[in-house]
Amino acid sequence: MYSSIMSLVFLLPIVAVVNLISNQSHFLMTLLSLEGITLSLVLFVPISLSIMSASNVSISVILLTFGACEASLGLSLMVLMSRSYGTDMLNSLTANKC
């Protein structure tokens, strides 16, 4: 039981990082990849604490709070960028607008 869950938890951040590397052009896909990494941390911490028989589960709540803050900041930046530049493409940020 634990081996299948742990393999899924170890596989999830790898898939999210590969998605982050392969989809660097769209801001929304970058945000989704970062949320996948945060989700894997939220899943990994309680599982590892239960394996080590630790009783402190407040760390996962703190990580979940930081994940929610990250999501709200990312979406507000995406709305600001799409209103300013008209697109969510990341290469529009680096283009020279002389």
Swiss-Prot record:
Q: Which InterPro entries match?
A: NUOK/Mnh_C1-like (IPR039428)
List membrane-spanning regions: 1-21, 27-47, 61-81
UniProt-listed Gene3D superfamilies:
1.10.287.3510
Topology of the protein relative to the lipid bilayer = Multi-pass membrane protein
In short, the EC number is 7.1.1.2
As one GO molecular function, the record gives: NADH dehydrogenase (ubiquinone) activity
- Which reactions fall under this protein's catalytic activity? a ubiquinone + NADH + 5 H(+)(in) = a ubiquinol + NAD(+) + 4 H(+)(out)
Keywords of this entry = Electron transport, Membrane, Mitochondrion, NAD, Respiratory chain, Translocase, Transmembrane, Transmembrane helix, Transport, Ubiquinone
Q: Per its database record, what is this protein's job? A: Core subunit of the mitochondrial membrane respiratory chain NADH dehydrogenase (Complex I) that is believed to belong to the minimal assembly required for catalysis. Complex I functions in the transfer of electrons from NADH to the respiratory chain. The immediate electron acceptor for the enzyme is believed to be ubiquinone.
Q: What is this protein called?
A: NADH-ubiquinone oxidoreductase chain 4L
The coding gene here is ND4L
